[in-house]
Amino acid sequence: LVTLANSTDDKGQFLFSGYQDNTKPFVQSGMDIQYAGDQGQRLTQVSSSRQLAISDAGADVFERIKNGNGVFKTAADPLNTGTGIIDVGSVIDPTSLTGDQDEINFTVTNGATTFDVVNTTTGTSVSAGNAYTNNHTISVDGMQLSIKGEPANGDKFTVSPSNNQSIFETVSKIVTALETPSSGQPGAATRLTNILGATLKDIESGLEHVLAKQTAIGARLQEIDTLDSVGSDQDIQFQQSLAELQGVDFAKAISDLQRQQL
């Protein structure tokens, strides 16, 4: 993936380093990957009045990718001990979105499971004492999500606005989750399921983002090829016209024109 991000063109110039086409855009140290380019986008003149981009900043292609579902993200607290699994959720009413963070807290008393929803941004209660059933759907502030399984007493889940996350960070999270020992750890299997569920969605979003950028680049390259083809055709026409003009007997042509004017 880093090799792809450090791709070069046929001149050996890096495609995703902004204006710094001689600088490798992404530098890797273990699992840490830093962007070393800038935010520039190189342009080429395709006509007297128009320019087209021939590069993209690597930060825009590989790092500015919204995590979660693109609007908000869900997460299980790493200290949860139950088997509650939360999905990525969806937006059901964009006009009700607040951009606040919410927390879903579970209580289990005498075998009955309830949950409270708290807006942790404002510190206010959204709802309390809600009865929980398996595969429960929860709606809050224009968002909808589901939790299945059996959350334990004290387990909690968060819902917060999506933020930019690089595709490298997403892959790193998956690797870390898979390498973390789970034997004998309460809720470890459920914790892994929650992490993989979230990060696989992030991978999907990352691939969609990169493919969209690739499509845009391909469209620009195709337009440049088309303009080159049109320019070549015009060159041929100009050469033919020039050849015809060079073959004209100008003395005879002037004489004929004068006779026509008499």
Regions found by a protein language model. Name each.
Residues 24-188:
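Cysteine-poor, low-complexity segments in flexible/peripheral regions
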